[in-house]
Amino acid sequence: MIWRLCKQCIAVDEHALNRRRVVQGLLAAALPLGTLSCGKGSGGMATGEPLVVGGLPVTCNLTLPVACVAKARSNGALAAGQPRFEYRYSKYSGWPEVKESLMAGRIQAAYMLAPLVMDLADRKVPVKIVSLGHRSGAVIMVRTDSPYQTFRQLAGKQIAIPSRFAVDFLFLRKMLAQENMTPADIHIVEMAPPDMPAALYANAVDAYCTGEPFGAAAQQAGYARPLRMTRDEWRNYICCVLTVREELIQQNPAMVQDLVNQVLGAGVWLDQRQENRSKAVAIAAGRDFFNQDPKIIQFVMENPVDRVTYGDLRMIRAEFEELMQLSIAAGTIKHAIAYETYMDETFAKNARAAAISL
């Protein structure tokens, strides 16, 4: 059974409460007050109009801030008459908000959870996946002073997940299957990722499974360590994918192609050298993007360097099929969905990684 656990439900002493406030302060941007204002016309449908791209302040979305800034700089070097595209990042507090904005057409593009896009497309929402945004980047965290050395030792323990729709939950299920365990062997609670580090510190949960930087926040603070990481267990892990509405594909395919090129270029650039990752941290930590403590994002980039990767953004059909089957087994997708229903490979096949100069 999956229970929802809110931060008001976590019983902590005064010291733990103060520690929670510190951790949440470091990650304040992960709970933004709202999205940047963007009307229905801000999707980049008109010539010369910026394309608003929704995303969350998580490292799985790091290629997006890099792409936005790099494109703005390259526009300044274009000769008169050359097509200019502009991309504007819009920060959201959670996947439901991104989903609603994309469904309503308030935004035309966003980084989304891959299984969620599959489900939306199956329900006739006109959206398509056009690129990956990253690989890997999920962790299962336990307290540093806990006795847990193997995943099986978590049997009977309370483990937090963002939601049953999150790909992190599929990662947890893969680890259960690896040990011949089922979700019935543990106690699963749903919890907002920004609350997870404090909940672990307060012993309100025994472990949590989520994406970065919420694992790194507790690890850097010294009271948590990763028990399992996708880099070791599921290297081709896919969570966030670049998704666009079909009317944008139909009305401005050149813009979609350029955006895919920019994201691909950002991924290559991020994985080329550590210096580039540090530059990306400085960009993403700013108020226009994640608005987070740069030390935590930098920790994700270095410990280890392949904790999250961006250089291999190939869209491989078999990987999406595996993700779908895992989602069906988890009950978040009800039936098999044709690959072509949610995927448009055209832009990835024609992609040329943009040169990133930052």
Ranges and model annotations:
Residues M1-N18, L26-P32:
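N-terminal secretory signal peptides
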Residues L36-S37:
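C-terminal motif of bacterial Sec signal peptides marking the signal peptidase cleavage site
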Residues M45-T182, H187-E190, D206-E212, Y223, ...:
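Short, glycine-/small- and polar/acidic-enriched structural segments
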Residues P57, K91, W95, F165-F169, ...:
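Solvent-exposed, acidic/flexible segments
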Residues E100, A104, M118, R152, ...:
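Solvent-exposed, polar/charged alpha-helical surfaces in well-ordered, non-transmembrane soluble domains
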Residues P115, S146, D195-D288:
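Pocket-lining segment of extracytoplasmic ligand-binding domains
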Residues Q250-H335:
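Secondary-structure end/capping motifs
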Residues L323-L358:
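Conserved C-terminal helix/tail region of periplasmic/extracytoplasmic solute-binding proteins
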